[in-house]
UniProtKB/Swiss-Prot annotation:
<dbReference type="GO" id="GO:0005829">
    <property type="term" value="C:cytosol"/>
</dbReference>
<dbReference type="InterPro" id="IPR036510">
    <property type="entry name" value="Ribosomal_bS20_sf"/>
</dbReference>
<dbReference type="GO" id="GO:0070181">
    <property type="term" value="F:small ribosomal subunit rRNA binding"/>
</dbReference>
<comment type="similarity">
    <text>Belongs to the bacterial ribosomal protein bS20 family.</text>
</comment>
<dbReference type="InterPro" id="IPR002583">
    <property type="entry name" value="Ribosomal_bS20"/>
</dbReference>
<dbReference type="GO" id="GO:0003735">
    <property type="term" value="F:structural constituent of ribosome"/>
</dbReference>
<dbReference type="GO" id="GO:0015935">
    <property type="term" value="C:small ribosomal subunit"/>
</dbReference>
<dbReference type="GO" id="GO:0006412">
    <property type="term" value="P:translation"/>
</dbReference>
<comment type="function">
    <text>Binds directly to 16S ribosomal RNA.</text>
</comment>
<protein>
    <recommendedName>
        <fullName>Small ribosomal subunit protein bS20</fullName>
    </recommendedName>
</protein>
<keyword id="KW-0699">rRNA-binding</keyword>
<keyword id="KW-0694">RNA-binding</keyword>
<keyword id="KW-0687">Ribonucleoprotein</keyword>
<keyword id="KW-0689">Ribosomal protein</keyword>
<dbReference type="Pfam" id="PF01649">
    <property type="entry name" value="Ribosomal_S20p"/>
</dbReference>
Amino acid sequence: MPIIKSAIERVRVNEKAAARNASQMSAMRTAIKKFDKAKLAGADNLDDLYKAAISAIDHAHSKGLIKANKAARDKSRLSARYAK
């Protein structure tokens, strides 16, 4: 455990950031899975789920959780599944 006050604060801040990042990544994956599940089931609200998944990917990229190439790849694959 850190002894210096600033190091203690960094540990606390890093834990909060890690929890926030994990939550955001989970939300992105969940949005993509919801879209895929709805696509297989032939749901009516496919447009809304597609937009939500794209938005989640963009948000994760803007926060630096995923790199630009992964965001583009995920969006491209999602769009291909949406078009089928």
